Amino acid sequence: MIKKSLLPLALGGFGIGMTEFVMMGILPDIAGGLDITIPQAGYLITAYALGVVVGAPTLVSLVAKRPPRSVLIWFMLMFAVFNALSALAPNFGLMLVSRFLAGLPHGAFFGVGAVVASRLADEGKVAAAMATMFTGLTLANVIGVPLGTYLGHNFSWRLVFLIVAAIGLLTAISLRQWVPVIEARPSAGFRKDLGIFRKPGLWMALAITSIGTGGFFAWFSYIAPLLTDLSRFAPGQIPMIMTVVGVGMTVGVVLGGRLADRFAPIHAIVILLTTMTALLAMNGLFATSQTAMLVLAFATGANALAMGPPIQMLLMEHSREAEMLGSSLGQSGFNVGNATVAFLGGI
């Protein structure tokens, strides 16, 4: 039975997952609407990812002494405003800025949210509680991304970002109603918190996160043109395939939580990185087979999100003196990989 207090974290994860991953499905629509090329539109993915990289440690450091619940509420209000700006952006330049701003609270929310989930979790169920939050992100790929892709193709991509903004506002309200007040743990100060960066184990975890997930983001950033140009799927079939990916992600994050609770996080990560390498290779080998790509869409999505809980636990293990800062770095690491491959793909 999922605790009611964890549901707002899942809802926030849903909104964040939708705004990040729906871009892959509506990239051609945005390109057409702003009169730019698809590779240029890919820079919007890079801008959002850079916002995550910058925002996660910066925002968390600024609010380290504040109660986590109030911090999460403010992050979601920022998220709502900046996604509304994306919906209203009249040109590529302003859209680029709005996507960067929308990315700022992303990693910070997951970083603080992971700490809140760990404090609300029953004994021995910390990774499972974190997985509940990440389940919202994966459900976005089952429901939100296909819906957003459909709306972007058939109505307007701007409507998609307005819906995301509304989800952010609803999350802020539910956080206030359902999440108990949790006192901030004493902070030694910003400079001392930065001492966690002297730990080799933290850098190892960040390298695993950014480099290890780069291949997945390279695949996912350009999944729509990959499926239409090489696999010969019709554009109208892309929402269905995004649903398949999302179902895989949902299954994967649950399995990842169980793996991380049962085994040492680093052991789980090694297994998952090995299988991800094999899956990405098969995506290249069987790109012209529609049947194979449907199976691989599910498996690749599952493997990618299964890495979330063990990576989050590994980061927290190496940053106990500044748990919110350390936890937020996971999303920075993920999006270093995301920003890099989206940029390289747009060249």
Identify the function of each model-found stretch:
Residues 54-93:
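Conserved MFS/SLC helix-loop-helix module at the cytosolic interface between two early adjacent transmembrane helices
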Residues 56-67, 252-264:
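Helix-to-loop junctions at the C-terminal end of transmembrane segments
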Residues 98-136:
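Cytoplasmic helix-loop-helix junction between adjacent transmembrane helices
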Residues 266-311:
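C-terminal transmembrane helical hairpin of 12-TM major facilitator-type secondary transporters
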Residues 7, 78, 82-85, 93-102, ...:
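Paired small-residue
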Residues 92-94, 122-177, 222, 226:
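Helix-loop-helix hairpin linking two adjacent transmembrane segments in secondary transporters
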Residues 318-347:
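A late C-terminal transmembrane helix in Major Facilitator Superfamily
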Residues 35, 67, 88-94, 232, ...:
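Helix-breaking motifs and short loop linkers at transmembrane-helix boundaries and internal kinks
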